Swiss-Prot record:
Keywords: Chaperone, Cytoplasm, DNA replication, Metal-binding, Repeat, Stress response, Zinc, Zinc-finger. Its main location: cytoplasm. Gene3D superfamilies: DnaJ domain, Heat shock protein DnaJ, cysteine-rich domain, Urease metallochaperone UreE, N-terminal domain. This is Chaperone protein DnaJ. A zinc finger (CR-type) spans 128-206. Binds 2 Zn(2+) ions per monomer. GO terms for biological process: chaperone cofactor-dependent protein refolding; DNA replication; protein refolding; response to heat. It comes from Nitrosomonas europaea (strain ATCC 19718 / CIP 103999 / KCTC 2705 / NBRC 14298). InterPro entries: DnaJ (IPR012724), DnaJ_C (IPR002939), DnaJ_domain (IPR001623), DnaJ_domain_CS (IPR018253), HSP40/DnaJ_pept-bd (IPR008971), HSP_DnaJ_Cys-rich_dom (IPR001305), HSP_DnaJ_Cys-rich_dom_sf (IPR036410), J_dom_sf (IPR036869).
Length: 369
């Protein structure tokens, strides 16, 4: 037992009445409660002293003994009539700390948010679009206007919790509140339910909504429609609808941020001799000059031919990746010409095929080691 002066511990005078004691105790207990001072041993010790002081001074018999004889007059006992007063006060503190004071939970609840996955084309993402979607959701019953009761009647106060929505369970010094199982926390019960919603206050319906897709949206972006989620309970506001964007695969382009990529196959003759080719863009077509000797993997960048982002408003590029295509199903004449070309190239192949020469030199060095 602490030997501190109990009146000083609570910060009250020796003539303090019951209300002053309780007010001082509640204020100090909330300040030094272990749940608010995790790991603070000094606060924990202070809390124990505060609890001990209030238990003694809130019991008239113990307080009288303490006032006359000090700590010696207590004889170690901490039970007796004051325990109930301590329990009530401590349960008030516990309720304040964990948000359980007052008339139980509010019966007004916000509706749940909904998620809808929307697949769009690359063109829709780039240019923006407007589309319609159908979603199943809870809506307030038009017949009972959300009360759940048959028209002409109204919900009654729950007799189990007296309308609080919660019931209090006493366990030793602690008082724990639990949701009332009779009214499920609403504080009301419906004895004559609505025939359309069967007492729920809401019905399930298919809702058609128009959705405007802003230009530049990307995979995983979401569009929030406020108030288009599930209906709230007992007058609570509706939740929100989150539309999550997914991009359908495109036959030509692949998106990377605001940039677009595409593969451009060219013949080996165009690659060798050079030329001009036409490539697709989101807006139509563009022409590219291919220099002689172009190899597979060469990238041609078309500035500002990508997508304008929805957030930063910067426009990406179109990157065209060259793939030199080897001809197949050759005619006899084509084979003859290629064989003639190969024969001529053999005389000075290193000049015409610099990469092959470099590779051969590296291979010889490797095997020579």
């Amino acid at each position: 037992m602490s030997q501190s002066d109990y009146y000083e511990v609570l910060g009250v005078g020796r003539d303090a009445d019951e209300n002053e004691l309780k007010k001082a105790y509640r204020k100090l207990a909330m300040k030094y409660h272990p749940d608010r001072n995790a790991g603070d041993t000094k606060a924990e010790e202070r809390f124990k002293n505060i609890k001990e002081a209030y238990e003694i001074l809130s019991d008239p018999n113990k307080r009288a003994a303490y006032d006359q004889f000090g700590h010696a007059g207590l004889n170690g006992g901490m039970g007796g009539a004051g325990a109930q007063g301590f329990s009530d006060a401590f349960s008030d503190i516990f309720s304040d700390l964990f948000g359980m004071r007052g008339g139980g939970r509010s019966s007004v609840h916000r509706g749940a948010d909904l998620r809808y996955n929307l697949e769009i084309t690359l063109e829709q993402a780039a240019r923006g679009a407007e589309t319609q979607i159908r979603i199943p959701r809870q809506e307030v019953c038009d017949t009972c206007h959300g009360s759940g009761a048959k028209p002409g009647t109204s919900p009654k106060t729950c007799p189990t919790c007296n309308g609080h929505g919660q019931i209090r369970m006493q366990q030793g010094f602690f008082s724990i509140q639990q949701t009332c199982s009779h009214c499920q926390g609403s504080g009301k019960v419906v004895s004559d339910p609505c025939g359309d919603c069967h007492g729920a206050g809401w019905v399930k319906r298919q809702k058609t909504l128009s959705v405007r897709i802003p230009a530049g949206v990307d995979e995983g972006d979401s569009i929030r429609l406020t108030g288009e989620g599930e209906a709230g309970a007992n007058g609570g506001q509706a939740g929100d609808l989150y539309i999550v964007i997914h991009l359908a695969s495109h036959p030509v382009f692949q998106r990377e941020g605001n940039h677009l990529h595409c593969e451009i196959p060219i013949s080996f003759t165009v690659a060798a001799l050079g030329g001009e080719i036409e490539v697709p863009t989101l807006d139509g077509h563009a022409r590219i000059k291919v220099p002689a000797g172009t190899q597979t993997g060469k990238i041609f960048r078309l500035r500002s031919k990508g997508i304008t982002g929805v957030r930063n408003q910067s426009t990406g590029d179109l990157l065209c990746h060259v793939a030199v295509e080897t001809p197949v199903d050759l005619t006899a004449r084509q084979k003859e010409l290629l064989e003639e070309f190969e024969s001529i190239s053999q005389k000075d192949g290193s000049r015409h095929h610099p990469r092959a020469k470099s590779w051969m030199e590296k291979a010889r060095e490797f095997f020579a080691e």
